[in-house]
Curated annotation (Swiss-Prot):
Organism: Salmonella typhimurium (strain LT2 / SGSC1412 / ATCC 700720)
Gene it is expressed from: pphB
GO biological process assignments: RNA decapping
InterPro entries: Ap4A_hydrolase, Calcineurin-like_PHP_ApaH, Metallo-depent_PP-like
Protein name (record): Serine/threonine-protein phosphatase 2
Cofactor dependence: Mn(2+)
Positions annotated as active site in the UniProt record: 78 (proton donor)
Amino acid sequence: MELIRYADINSDLYRHIWVVGDIHGCYSLLLTRLAQLNFSPDTDLLISTGDNIDRGKENLETLRLLNTPWFISVVGNHEAMALDAFETQDGNFWYVNGGYWYDSVTEKDRQEATELLLTFKQRPHIIEVETSSKKYVIAHADYPDDSYDYGKQVDIDSVLWSRDRLLGSLQGNIHPIRGADTFIFGHMIVDYTTTFANQIYIDTGSFCSGNLSFFKIK
């Protein structure tokens, strides 16, 4: 049984820290937006909510960001689908959800993509960032508990896939999560950055809307 992996970030090491919603292979769009934000790779950090691949056209270029010191990512359900495809040797579920690009690249690029995707077997599902005034928690889809605690083992499928909390909030069933000030999620597309209680949703459908959203932690 796979355990939930956590990572904590020392905010004092960075001038600015941004969280970006699901990139989905929209590498050029990401670079354009970072330039608009005056992002500096030398002093700033970018945290991705996962789903860096699929649906967009620049998947390997996006994955290569994992080699840079200024970019980190939690695991998204699309990275999880890729890992499952590698393990089971059955890529059908991944391919119909956008993973078809993997078979369209050269053998050399496919090997590079495989190596980068396999690093998600060690990457965190949940990232915590504490600044001088607030504690932030980043996960792909949800933190499936009423109270957050670093290292707590929560349901991994819900962290990667669940839409229940957001759908409930959209229907007026809004509840804060204790244990941190702000939770930042991607996964389910919203028209614009959306906040319910202390939860912020920033997947604005980069691959179909051309809108890639960010949240500034510091």
